Amino acid sequence: MISDIKKILYATDLSPNSAHAFRYAVYFAKKFDAEIIILHVIEGASQDAVKALELYMDKQYLKKTLEKREDHAVERLKNRLRIFCDKELTDDPEFVEKIGSIEAYRGYPAEEILKKTEELNCDAIIMGTHKRSSTYTFLGTVAKRVLRRARKPVFIIPLPKGMTDLSFYDD
């Protein structure tokens, strides 16, 4: 039996083209009357990088700096969501209420996406691919790992050829 999709995890890398994959998350949320959880994972620094930083910063300052980075990612996501809604959801301003939460974590992206999908009881995962060149779209290692290990449906959204959508661009 196919289970209902009531909660969608939309994983974003904050690239300007991520609006295209978010459109699919919005489409599915409307179609299934589902909630969207927006997730961004900040790749953790390598152990070598952390050790090098600790030579120049005390651990408390380093911890605060990393926390600020997470807060900044959440603020960027909120700003992008506002821009997207203002631009593309003028006919449905109440849709914003379907956004359950905006989450940002440090870690390995594929592992965090899979972990949060289970923790938050999401029924599906939506994420985009990276554009590698004008001749083909590259399915990134994060998408491959999620696709291989997920126990929920995963929708990988390719970027159409030549598309450069700056709907999320906020820099």
Report the location of each language-model feature.
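A conditional alpha-helix N-cap/helix-loop micro-motif detector
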Residues: 18, 106, 135-136
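Gly/Ser-rich helix-loop-strand patches that form or flank binding pockets
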Residues: 4, 115-165
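A short acidic, glycine-rich active-site loop
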Residues: 59-79
